[in-house]
């Protein structure tokens, strides 16, 4: 089933995969293909109707050269697909590790990233109402 899901990406044969314990809401797997290392996400929670917005936003940020885990489109152009009856995304595996204790340099880097994020989305035709607006309160 996994090999059939991965074939349309045209990234080569499956070499290895393993689950990632650090996921918070979704099931995530490291996937090694002939073309490199990736993360496969099976979306377990959240509103499925929000997924196209998230995919489009991450694509926009990737196009702006921000280091984000964007959804890779398959050969048919579809980035949001289905595996085992769940929405699924294949993303590049980003380098790095989780920071356990942030310092001033980390905060500077986050500030710079947020500035670049705002610039990248300032003219984006993307819109999604907040889930935590006044009606939520």
Regions found by a protein language model. Name each.
Residues 1-8:
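Extreme N-terminal tail/first-helix region
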Residues 2, 24-27, 54:
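Short N-terminal amphipathic alpha-helix/helix-capping patch enriched in small hydrophobics
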Residues 9-32:
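ATP-binding glycine-rich phosphate-binding loop
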Residues 19, 74, 130:
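Residue-level "edge-of-site" marker
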Residues 33-126:
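ATP-binding pocket architecture of kinase catalytic cores
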Residues 130-137:
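Active-site catalytic-loop/activation-segment of kinase and kinase-like phosphoryl-transfer enzymes
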């Amino acid at each position: 089933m996994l090999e059939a899901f991965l074939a349309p990406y045209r990234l080569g044969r499956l070499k290895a995969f393993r689950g990632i314990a650090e996921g918070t809401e979704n099931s995530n797997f490291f996937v090694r293909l002939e073309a490199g290392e990736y993360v496969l996400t099976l979306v377990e929670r959240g509103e499925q109707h929000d997924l196209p917005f998230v995919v489009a936003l991450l694509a926009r940020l990737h196009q702006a050269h921000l280091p984000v885990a964007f959804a890779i489109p398959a050969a048919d152009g579809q980035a949001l697909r289905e595996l085992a009856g769940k929405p699924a995304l294949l993303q590049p595996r980003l380098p790095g590790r989780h920071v356990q204790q942030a310092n001033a340099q980390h905060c500077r880097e986050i500030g710079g990233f947020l500035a670049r994020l705002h610039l990248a989305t300032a003219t984006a035709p993307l819109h999604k109402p907040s889930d935590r607006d006044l009606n939520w309160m």
